[in-house]
UniProtKB/Swiss-Prot annotation:
It is found in: Nucleus. A zinc finger (C2H2-type) spans 172-194, 200-222, 228-250, 256-278, 284-306, 312-334, 340-362, 368-390, 396-418, 424-446, 452-474. The keyword Repeat applies. Residues 4-75 form the KRAB domain. This is Zinc finger protein 253. Coiled coil: none annotated. It comes from Homo sapiens. Expressed in bone marrow and in monocytic and immature erythroid cell lines.
Amino acid sequence: MGPLQFRDVAIEFSLEEWHCLDTAQRNLYRDVMLENYRNLVFLGIVVSKPDLVTCLEQGKKPLTMERHEMIAKPPVMSSHFAQDLWPENIQNSFQIGMLRRYEECRHDNLQLKKGCKSVGEHKVHKGGYNGLNQCLTTTQKEIFQCDKYGKVFHKFSNSNTYKTRHTGINLFKCIICGKAFKRSSTLTTHKKIHTGEKPYRCEECGKAFNQSANLTTHKRIHTGEKPYRCEECGKAFKQSSNLTTHKKIHTGEKPYKCEECGKAFNRSTDLTTHKIVHTGEKPYKCEECGKAFKHPSHVTTHKKIHTRGKPYNCEECGKSFKHCSNLTIHKRIHTGEKPYKCEECGKAFHLSSHLTTHKILHTGEKPYRCRECGKAFNHSTTLFSHEKIHTGEKPYKCDECGKTFTWPSILSKHKRTHTGEKPYKCEECGKSFTASSTLTTHKRIHTGEKPYKCEECGKAFNWSSDLNKHKKIHIERKPYIVKNVTDLLNVPPLLISIR
C-alpha cells in the first residue's frame, strides 16, 4: 500500500447524492472534510491542497468526480457488513455516499469481522493510517450501530453528537489547555480565550466580546431590556442565569454546601467566598499599601482611603460619599423612605441597624455596662459616648470656633450653626432644620403624635423633655430611698435637680 492520501479519508458525492442532502448535512460534510485535511497537513502527509478542499473553502459544490464515473461505481460492501446494515438500515443518500469511500479501502487495509459493530474496532495495519489515528481524537473512519435505537450512524451524520448524548464524553479537546467540549463549535468559541480574539463589538460603547451571545447580553445595559421575568414576584433580569439564581430565593434551594461547617448557599460564588472564613486566606491585596483582604469588594472600598475621593454625589443636595451604599442610605433623608419596620410597635427606620437598636427597648435588655461606674445601656454606642464623661475625651474639633465634641455627628450639626445650612425641610409647612432629629420632633405638631408616655399615670407627650418635666410631679410625692452605693450612683437627675 502506498502513502496515505487525502482521498483515503475523503468522501465524494455524485450530483444526485449532493442534491439529496439538506443544508445541515452539507455544512457538516464541509466541516468534517476540512478538519480531515487540516489533520493530514498537521501530520505532514499532505503537501498540495486537493481540489475538493478548494471547492469547500470557496463554498462550491464538492463534485470532484465526473457524474458517469460516480454512477459507474456502485458501493462495494463487505458481505458481512452488507448483510447486517445494507440496505434496510441505510435509507438516505448521505449515509450511502459516506459509506462508499470507506468500503473502497480493501481487505488489505481493514479486516472486517462478522458481527462487529464498529469498523474502528479493527486495527489499521498500515503506518499511514496509524499516524492518522494518533492525530484524530475521534476515529474518523468509525461506523457503528446503536443497539438502543437500531439505527446506523456515522461520524459525518452526527455520530459524535449521538455518542456524546449517550456516553457524556467530551470529544473535542483544546490543544492549548486540555479542556474538552461536546461540540466543535464550542471548542472554536473557547479557543478565542487563548488568542484574545474579540470579533463582536458593541456599536454603542465599543466594547468587544468573544461570543455574539455575550454581546447580545451586554447590549441590554444600553437598552435597559430585562427579558427574563420571575413568575413568582415579577422581578425582571437581563440574563437567564440571574433569573435561575433568583428563583432559589422563592424555593429556598441552597445546593452549594460548605463541607467544613455545613452552611449552604444559593450560589457557588457565595460558597467560594464563605470558604475563606475557614482558611483565613486573604488573596486580595492593595497595591498601594500591601494590606490584604478576603473579598475583592473590600479592596475596592479600601482603595478609596488612598484616593480620598468621594465619587458618589447626591443629586438632591450635592453631598458626596465614598461608598454607593452610603449614598443610597442618605437619599432616604430626602425621600422619607423607612424600609425597616418594627413588628412590635410599627415604628419604621432608615437603617436596619437602627431597627436592631430599637428592638432592645421592647426587651428592656441593657447588655452594655460601664466598667467605671457600673451603669448599663441598651446600645454599645451609648456606652461609648457615656465613657467619655469619665475620660473627658472630645476628639472632634470645630475648625471655625475651636469647640470640641465627643461625636463626629454632633460636630457636623454644630458646623451648621456657622454655615446656616438647614437641609431638613418639613413637607407640611416648609420649615427647615439643621438636624433630622429636630425635623422628626417638629412633624409631631402636624401629626399629633405623642410617643413619650408616663408609666406612672399614662399621660403622653410630644417631646421627651415635656415628659421629664411631668415626672417631677410624681417624684416630689415619693421619697427616693438609697440602700447601697449602686443606688446612689443611679439617682435620677431629675431628683437631684429637685432636691
